[in-house]
């Protein structure tokens, strides 16, 4: 039995609303001691899913607060256990006093994310849906919130489950032929397995692409500004975010550390990272800044290579090498206002701008939006939220399917079946069916207390 099983009989409680004073505050309780706690608070009768107005009493029958109590009996509750929600005034002092009373009556303080964890362990949610709750709460824009809503509704889960069933059927088919190893694989069986492998690969590739898109929607496009010193990277960052966040001087090498700012263009989130200019000289601190610049490029979704429009030279072999591993690169010719003649730019990946006057910034923002969403936005209704671990698990799944295809080409049926088993295992990590306890602990520990 899993160490994280909820079959331990304990009852958990936590404040479920945000910290600070508010009109309403909620305490959520889940577990087998609900009726004992309700009685201790002064409630004698509770009807399922009915809002009871009541007074919440302390050990001396003094009123802590008054409000509504709602009982959700198991298994028809969020966690799958008996759940009691207490809705009172949003005073932090009163909420803490009421929570303490619940703990005195037999509950314990819930861990971060423990309510969602219990919902997962009791089969009320899969892991994708549990994570979608946190993604919806933390969404920085409406589109990301709607994508998280679709994951909570099961859009991502159903696609993963469909692929898992295909993997199972295909593995059964392959293993059935192993019993006849002394016979050559007939043409019909060979064609069916080959077609199934190809179909699986196509659908996995599409799901991986959609998951990468979902991750960008939730996390924002991680966009790193790089280039030689004194080309206006910090000025461009300030212009894009609309404030003087980065220090700007005429002295090359002013920026020596990375600076991150989240910004929204067209309702979409971007994480902009200003970095130290790359050149072959500088003191120890500046060299450390350049090292950090190269490290940032390793995690970048997009690199904005900022060059001086008057002399657009990259000037760094290290930067040129690092850019080869970045998924998307956009070239920015800054200081457009200093040109005596209009720029003759033919490359669509080059955008002339002026951080000083704002010329070209709207074009840049529109291009950034296109890079995040793709060339079309016709897939809005199918969008779902995703995380880095989902993308990585799909990548491992796809790699095993590719290896299965290769092994099948050599009629290595045992190895083909094994690769399909490993693909199924990797895919199962996404919805939690194959996730170890340690991974579950890390995931739920990042949730809010009370969720």
UniProtKB/Swiss-Prot annotation:
Top-tier EC class: hydrolase
GTP-binding keyword on record: yes
Any one GO cellular component localisation term in the record: cytosol
Subcellular location as annotated: Cytoplasm
Cofactor stoichiometry and binding remark: Binds 1 potassium ion per subunit.
Gene name per UniProt: mnmE
Cofactors: K(+)
GO molecular function: GTP binding; GTPase activity; metal ion binding
Organism of origin: Xylella fastidiosa (strain Temecula1 / ATCC 700964)
The EC number(s) this enzyme carries: 3.6.-.-
Protein name in UniProt: tRNA modification GTPase MnmE
């Amino acid at each position: 039995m899993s160490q994280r099983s909820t079959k331990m009989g304990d009852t958990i409680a936590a404040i479920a609303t945000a910290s600070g004073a508010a009109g309403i505050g909620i305490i959520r309780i889940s577990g087998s001691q609900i009726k004992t706690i309700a009685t201790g608070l002064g409630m004698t009768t509770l009807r399922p899913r009915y809002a009871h107005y009541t007074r919440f009493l302390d050990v001396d029958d003094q009123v802590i607060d008054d409000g509504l109590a709602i009982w959700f009996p198991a298994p028809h509750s969020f966690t799958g256990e008996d759940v009691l929600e207490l809705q009172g005034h949003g005073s932090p002092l009163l909420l803490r006093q009421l929570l303490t009373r619940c703990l005195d009556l037999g509950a314990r303080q819930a861990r971060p994310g423990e309510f969602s964890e219990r919902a997962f362990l009791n089969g009320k949610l899969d892991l994708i849906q549990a994570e979608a709750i946190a993604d919806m709460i933390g969404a920085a824009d409406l589109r990301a919130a709607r994508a998280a809503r679709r994951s909570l509704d099961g859009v991502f889960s159903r696609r993963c489950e469909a692929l898992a069933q295909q993997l199972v059927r295909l593995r059964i088919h392959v293993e059935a032929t192993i019993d006849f190893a002394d016979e050559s694989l007939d043409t019909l069986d060979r064609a069916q397995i080959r077609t199934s492998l190809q179909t699986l690969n196509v659908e996995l590739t599409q799901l991986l692409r959609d998951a990468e898109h979902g991750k960008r929607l939730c996390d924002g496009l991680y966009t790193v500004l790089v280039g030689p010193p004194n080309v206006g990277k910090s000025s461009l960052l300030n212009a894009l975010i609309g404030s003087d966040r980065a220090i700007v001087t005429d002295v090359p090498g002013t920026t020596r550390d990375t600076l991150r700012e989240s910004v929204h263009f067209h309702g979409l989130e971007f994480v902009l990272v200003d970095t130290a200019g790359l050149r072959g000289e500088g003191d120890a601190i500046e060299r450390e800044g350049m090292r950090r610049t190269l490290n940032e490029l390793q995690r970048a979704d997009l690199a904005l290579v900022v060059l001086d429009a008057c002399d657009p030279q990259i000037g760094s072999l290290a930067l040129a090498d690092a850019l080869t591993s970045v998924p998307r690169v956009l070239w920015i010719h800054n200081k457009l206002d200093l040109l005596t003649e209009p720029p003759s730019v033919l490359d669509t990946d080059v955008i002339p701008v002026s951080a000083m006057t704002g010329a070209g910034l709207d074009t840049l923002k529109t291009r950034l939006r296109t890079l995040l969403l793709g060339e079309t936005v016709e897939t809005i209704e199918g969008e779902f939220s995703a995380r880095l671990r989902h993308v990585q698990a799909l990548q491992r799944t796809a790699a095993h399917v590719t290896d299965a295809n290769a092994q099948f080409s050599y009629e290595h049926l045992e190895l083909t079946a094994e690769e399909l088993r490993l693909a199924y295992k990797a895919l199962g990590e996404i919805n939690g069916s194959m996730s170890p306890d340690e991974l579950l602990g890390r995931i739920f520990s990042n949730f809010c207390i009370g969720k």
